């Protein structure tokens, strides 16, 4: 190689070189003129498609890589411009000396450029760089690049590819498969040179290039068959090509350049020839690892100077802008090829410029991959042609992302650099696999596309050569620095290589790199030939990978010593040799590797004649080792490793200098991974913002809190009152369950957390932190736990206080509350958040009178510019503004103001001002007070979607001031302003604060109201309390209601607390029994109520009732689980009120347990109930279970058992037993007595329950404004029920008989409790109910908002408890229930009772149904619970009821199913319409719910009683 380089530099064609250089210079000048662009355009265009040429810094990076290259570039520029010819002559002499045959071959392809290419491919490949520099020195550098790019890329694509292949073959014969890439790059350079030279020179050079291509082919064949050469070319593209690029790179690149020069001279014919020959040479060169590949290690080091050449080329070439990247890539490649073949040539040889032009498949690939793969270069790891890109990268710039880039771009498109940059990216991956996969795609490219691509690549190579030469001329050191920087900034394929070479800072290195580049370019040039392309592609990926590694090494070396080109070369060579050994010979494309490859090529005799450019001994060793490695094995290994390496290469952005590049791709990968791992640390501080996380894991678990009790239920979990163990501070824990979340974490919770963290205001609830129920975050992987949002604790909420009746708010209190509320809301709105769920239960109040807005689960960021619609299904119905009811989806903060206006009215009236259960009814209520929405008062209302479909029944005028005349004038003004129909006319929160009513209010100076310090009044508590009151205040209604709630709440609420639940269970039992009896007759309904009261009284009368005993007494069939539960449950004596005749007076336990539950507000058993609340809760759940089972058993056996039981007391017991299975939740000890007494009481108590059933208006739940008829029905219903129960009891159904027996038993017990019962049945029942309601309140209040009261909640807002909801929220619900379930029972009035009778006939079981249904009714949303408890029993009841009930039962049951017992009865009954509602509302599963629905009606009345609107 050195001899050849010497020959190329000094001798061998000195004249031809000088002439060629002069011609090339002339041509360059021509091309500098607009003429060159046209040539470049076709060539550059495909390259243009590819990523833009590496930026000048990349070029500089490449340039610094090779001081020699820079020197060569300078020499080239100087020689090209003036001293170029002498340098060329020297190079020619050297090239001739180095490889006479190789140089001749190269000369053959080139006239003048070929001489340079000879230099380049012979040792002068560096010389070629120098030669390129010379040519560029001629002043033609940019022009030559463009010209060469155009003519060479065309010719090079044709000839260049052919000549590259030939040169590779010639060089390959001489220097091994590396020759082909070298020759192809050489052809490009030759083409460039030929363009620079007279066309005759080009022609001669094309002829030479053809000859060289032929020689390379011969040598390829000599090397060992096309496949061996192919594999070699692939491997040598990566490894051997580097060595051979050094070897054949010198000869092949010089020869290739000659070829391309000659090809350039005859641009069209030469191009065709080149394409054909390029395909051949590519095939051969791909077979033989291109010398460029072998040489790339050295060339890379030298390439460090190349970037300068690149710069020069870019600056020199007017078209450089377009092709700069390809040219620079090619130039760097060609420079490398040149450098490797003739280090002496340094940048003087026109080849260096021509190299970019040179059509060598490698250079082309490179140039395409350079330009194309500029993105690839960025990726640095993804060079499509691992051969050129990786090896180029590695050897090229230690800095260097640029190296990667160049390698990528080069190796990327073996077919064509310009095909498409998108392709180049695809080829990035391809190039790695290209060696293996190029053939199919390459075949296509081998066609005209391949030729064009090769041309483009040549043009790029020419531009790259020009830029490299210019960069070399500029400064080797600057180029090295720039290359390092550029490499760091982005791994540009060519520039990166150039950077590496520049850091090598050896002109020889640059030449070697140029030679390598040329060879590689030849190999990649798609026009070389399908096989060549495939082989080269295959070879290139490993080459690129190796080069990338080498470049990384070189980058390291460059960083360490940009000036020390040898060190970088050696480092690159070492790593390359290692990588080549590991991966394949081609894989080691470091600068030293290139030289070594050249040397190895000599050793391997791939390119024996080509003198190797001066190489480091290490490089030589690496080359020899690489050469020793089998080409095929190397190819495979290189391909595999190249891909991995390319993938492993760190991205240029990650590499600040060349450190990462200097590192092996794997090292870079590791570093990248480390960075990614560090990112969590970066995020960690962000999480640190969420103090919760730092506190959470391990430090802040929910175990750090003592949970005191449940205070509410939210949309995604319960809310607990808790005490911080560390600080003793009271907090509210909002549980966020993850179990049922499909998305992992509830969006409402995420939204609430996100928003609350942005809101800091004294009137907005403060979220302190977030804790979990796991000690370790890893536990969440095993078991989805729960998160707890920790809030400051607020003692009350507005709804609980208003519902409690314990507090009276005066005007000043209301002013203070509204002032604080509007301040918080104004803050939210100024922060652009809509709360969208303002209601009394979300307004929290502490004992200091401070108001805080809570529950931001529905809140969202508001943007007036946002076009996306919002959902209008927000805000609880009672507080929903008319625009949302009419379908507005682009609402404003005015929606929250309306809600606050509703609250203002509620503070004065103590009840919700608009209580409807449906949107249409809600709009009707609003219209009655605020006037009907119409364009006159609300111009935009006509634009709303539902304006025409939701019109009120008639037009109302605004009566707000008349209706609320009792409100103070200032408050009324604000009230009127806040409830303006037109949201645009509605006041804003800020305006509200400026109104007369709130202007001068200072809440901090105002005394707080006299709040109940002993009781926290929350919504849940209020609901429970309401239920209890309902149970106590309205025996029948509350009894029915309570049982229903108990059913739904019983099991659930039993946990909450409520002896009521237990009593309701017995009540439910009684109801179930009475229902069983009346299933046949309408009166059964009332009996059900009576029986409920009787059962409650019985239970109360008994000191203690063991549920298991009760079940046994009743002969209720219970499963083992239920039996166990029942064994655990003892009915408190308090629940029974007194130990009367109940056979199981084991109440001491129950009583004691009762005190635990003491929440029942019933007069008689309040304390015991309070004590036994917990017990009652358990009892309630047990009762619910028992009732369900009893109902089932009753339904199945009701007929026969009832008939027989009527005849026999045992029969009654049996019937009761049958019934009790539905009543599993009614634990009554002494059931036999109870049954008897119940039967007795059913008769006796029926009137008594009727009395309590009739409630004073105060006790009655307020009528929902919309469904007053329902209210009437409720009242009528109660009366009817009272009477009807008697009728029912009197009616003799098998169930009726059983019920009668039970009622009698109850009555017997009750007579003892009669005093109690009047006050006690009502209240004991009430207590039972209270406990039930209390239970419900506890459970229901929490679930009330949900659907604890199925019928209530289902109908009305689920926010209020059934009664409260009915009255407060649930009036609408009540209405719904009334309209639906109760409506069916009520609407008929007495006929409804018959309907109920029918429904209860189904309902005697239906009564149990009522229980069960009550559960479902209570949980309209929890139909499952209802069915769990009552569904089966209902079915049983329905079945038994049908036969026993007779036609009525049969009709309801058959018509509706037992589930439809109530509904079926209703249908039959006059309450058909309401029944229809009930049926429709309840749905089949809720049909029995209609029995419950019946209760639901009762609960409706209770709801009203519960409602704040009525005297409560």
From Swiss-Prot:
Sites bearing Phosphothreonine, chain numbering: 588, 871, 1058, 1246
Catalytic activity, as annotated: [DNA-directed RNA polymerase] + ATP = phospho-[DNA-directed RNA polymerase] + ADP + H(+); L-seryl-[protein] + ATP = O-phospho-L-seryl-[protein] + ADP + H(+); L-threonyl-[protein] + ATP = O-phospho-L-threonyl-[protein] + ADP + H(+)
Residues the record marks as active site: 837
Gene Ontology cellular-component terms listed: cyclin K-CDK13 complex; cyclin/CDK positive transcription elongation factor complex; cytosol; extracellular region; extracellular space; ficolin-1-rich granule lumen; Golgi apparatus; nuclear cyclin-dependent protein kinase holoenzyme complex
Residues binding ATP, per UniProt: 711-719, 734
InterPro entries given in the database record: CDK, Kinase-like_dom_sf, Prot_kinase_dom, Protein_kinase_ATP_BS, Ser/Thr_kinase_AS
Biased composition (Basic and acidic residues): 189-198, 295-309, 511-522, 566-585, 660-670, 1043-1055, 1201-1210
Bias type Polar residues, positions: 490-510, 1056-1076, 1144-1153, 1468-1485
Subcellular location: Nucleus speckle
UniProt record, GO biological process: alternative mRNA splicing, via spliceosome; hemopoiesis; negative regulation of stem cell differentiation; positive regulation of transcription by RNA polymerase II; positive regulation of transcription elongation by RNA polymerase II; regulation of signal transduction
Tissue-wise expression: Expressed in fetal brain, liver, muscle and in adult brain. Also expressed in neuroblastoma and glioblastoma tumors.
Extent of Basic residues compositional bias: 92-109, 210-220, 418-435
Modified residues (N6-acetyllysine): 556
UniProt name for this protein: Cyclin-dependent kinase 13
GO MF, any single term: protein kinase binding
Cross-link (Glycyl lysine isopeptide (Lys-Gly) (interchain with G-Cter in SUMO2)): 519, 547
Similarity annotation: Belongs to the protein kinase superfamily. CMGC Ser/Thr protein kinase family. CDC2/CDKX subfamily.
Residues of the Protein kinase domain: 705-998
Free-text function comment from the UniProt entry: Cyclin-dependent kinase which displays CTD kinase activity and is required for RNA splicing. Has CTD kinase activity by hyperphosphorylating the C-terminal heptapeptide repeat domain (CTD) of the largest RNA polymerase II subunit RPB1, thereby acting as a key regulator of transcription elongation. Required for RNA splicing, probably by phosphorylating SRSF1/SF2. Required during hematopoiesis.
Biased composition regions of type Low complexity, renumbered to the chain: 160-171, 246-269, 383-401, 462-489
Organism (species): Homo sapiens
Phosphoserine: modified positions: 315, 317, 325, 340, 342, 358, 360, 383, 395, 397, 400, 437, 439, 525, 1048
Keywords: Acetylation, ATP-binding, Disease variant, Host-virus interaction, Intellectual disability, Isopeptide bond, Kinase, mRNA processing, mRNA splicing, Nucleotide-binding, Nucleus, Phosphoprotein, Serine/threonine-protein kinase, Transferase, Ubl conjugation
